């Protein structure tokens, strides 16, 4: 076997670290996966131990190589994709984190966001394409600097480094040599100007973050450096970085304007390619960098739903309605409909197009005849309804009418949910042969940088359809259900107020 036959993708997710080896055809050759602990120190707070993230990530990388029956010397490159916005600060001298990582789902900075909203929201939105929300990294960085004893002074002296998870992985992979991020991850911090492609002094001033902690922003596809000697058995080029949702968009080959994908993971994330135009949203969507190749930025509109597949975990762990996540489809299929039950899973507030931090989970339409099967079905449908609202907003903003939706992520294997998604959208929903599109996108980014794949055309030709779900619902029925859904959402909104939250 000649060397450099494969690409290794590191996929650092919210609940697990994974690694996948891909070949030239984009087929998976070996996989490693390990869950890690979620820490919930207070209501609304979510943290990860960054050392555990690193140890599980390097562990699964070795596992994937061994499962593929190859060595590090067989790799052409490594690509990295990561849970976005999750925020970490470490000591440059020791490489030790000064606190647990604050996860994207964490709401501790919501009151701070409210306090600066009137004065700064417009500036932040115009420059970053984001809404002012606790979800993004900037306010988390400020919280760490203000709440970890001595952190701000040490940051001013240049002793500390901030990074999203991609930065932390590259730092550790290179033995502390590189402190970098890519444009997609930088575009999720509230500190980066998506129009100039640089960290922005005005944004840094608003959020009180010193420039000295920031990583260098690089392309999403270029050779950044090599893995440290002794780490994997050979020094491998690290050549691609993309935030998970952007990487999935690339892996789904949504390479032209108006192409869109939806990833059904813990949350749901829909991105539509808008090419070189950073389309400002009038409907509370995000404008974000989709990828940056050779200094050229491609943009996307993004809508995020906080609770997607996580609603199934709640049925399993919170209500014990199912024993394992895989049982939900069979249970939901035992009834023909939810019999009018609507479940709005606003467990941590609502994302796009509402951005309501004070909404809470709500179930309406329950009668004595309601069973766990109706609740299971309502839970699956809730994911599709939330995604339909994102698409509605996207079409309004972009002026592009969607022809099809490409889907991926864990819950996209649920045929019942995908059929309902097509019904409620009124467009075909298409699942590709390789549903690990996040990791595949990272592999593509890395492979392009080292010439393993020659061009984005190569990538577009690799994408293959596995199953197509055609809409089967009448326009009248669709409108009726969407009206009912919006009524249910209205019941869930503004539930907590500041004084109670």
Swiss-Prot record:
CDD domains linked: FGGY_EcGK_like
The regulatory note on its activity is: Inhibited by fructose 1,6-bisphosphate (FBP).
Q: Tell me, what is an example of a GO biological process annotation in this record? A: glycerol metabolic process
Q: Does the keyword ATP-binding apply?
A: yes
Q: Where does ADP bind?
A: 14, 18, 266, 309, 410, 414
- Which domain of life, per UniProt? Bacteria
Q: Which residues bind glycerol?
A: 84-85, 135, 244-245
Q: Sorted alphabetically, which InterPro entries does this protein's record hold?
A: ATPase_NBD, Carb_kinase_FGGY, Carb_kinase_FGGY_CS, FGGY_C, FGGY_N, Glycerol_kin
Entry's EC annotation: 2.7.1.30
* Keyword flag Phosphoprotein: no
GO MF terms listed in the record are: ATP binding; glycerol kinase activity
Similarity comment? Belongs to the FGGY kinase family.
Protein name as catalogued: Glycerol kinase
Instruction: Supply the source organism for this entry.
Output: Deinococcus radiodurans (strain ATCC 13939 / DSM 20539 / JCM 16871 / CCUG 27074 / LMG 4051 / NBRC 15346 / NCIMB 9279 / VKM B-1422 / R1)
